[in-house]
């Protein structure tokens, strides 16, 4: 197995990054916060779905605009580490700020703003992350290595989601003494994802 890598340590770090960042997509974008936004903040599933979709679409447009410039810049200046840390920091802070997404309609603009900014940073971080693989992988094994990292990310997203669901949301006694007032046991998913991202 080791012969498919130039260096096993960068490969491990590469997989751990995928393990660390996937919960953002799983918990914030797809499951927990999307559902919370729909049911607790907006209260109208159809309206909430449209707003959530527009926010994701807007961030996707920004990603398409900025990605080529970011890619060109980091390739020219070899500043991969700086930009990866910056985008990771921004998306982590965005996830953490979702703690303040109280279950009231006035939270709509706040949540959607955080969603656009953090998803933009998350995806741009992915651009930088994907550009790193040729630095340590043998050329004809890049696909295999990318697949292993994706698997690690998929697993990380599931593990984090399970912890949040059964440790905070679907339990009478949420972890760390978190109560259910103002949906604190759901809002904590944001900071938990941020902590997961930073720790790994």
What are these regions (language model features)?
Residues 74-90:
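Cytoplasmic membrane-interface "Motif A"-like loop-to-helix N-cap segments
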């Amino acid at each position: 197995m080791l012969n498919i890598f130039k260096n096993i340590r960068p490969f491990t770090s590469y997989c751990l990054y995928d393990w660390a960042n996937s919960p953002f997509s799983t918990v914030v974008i797809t499951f927990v916060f999307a559902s919370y936004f729909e049911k607790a903040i907006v209260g109208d599933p159809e309206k909430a779905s449209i707003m959530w979709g527009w926010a994701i679409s807007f961030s996707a447009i920004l990603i398409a605009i900025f990605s080529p410039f970011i890619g060109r810049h980091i390739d020219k200046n070899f500043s991969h580490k700086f930009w990866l840390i910056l985008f990771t920091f921004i998306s982590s802070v965005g996830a953490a700020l979702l703690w303040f997404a109280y279950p009231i309609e006035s939270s709509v603009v706040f949540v959607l703003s955080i969603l656009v900014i953090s998803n933009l940073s998350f995806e741009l971080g992915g651009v930088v992350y994907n550009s790193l693989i040729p630095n340590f992988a043998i050329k004809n094994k890049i696909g295999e290595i990318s697949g292993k990292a994706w698997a690690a990310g998929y697993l990380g997203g599931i593990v984090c989601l399970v912890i949040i669901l059964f440790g905070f949301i679907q339990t009478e006694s949420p972890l760390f003494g978190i109560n259910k007032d103002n949906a604190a046991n759901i809002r904590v998913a944001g900071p938990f994802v941020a902590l997961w991202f930073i720790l790994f």
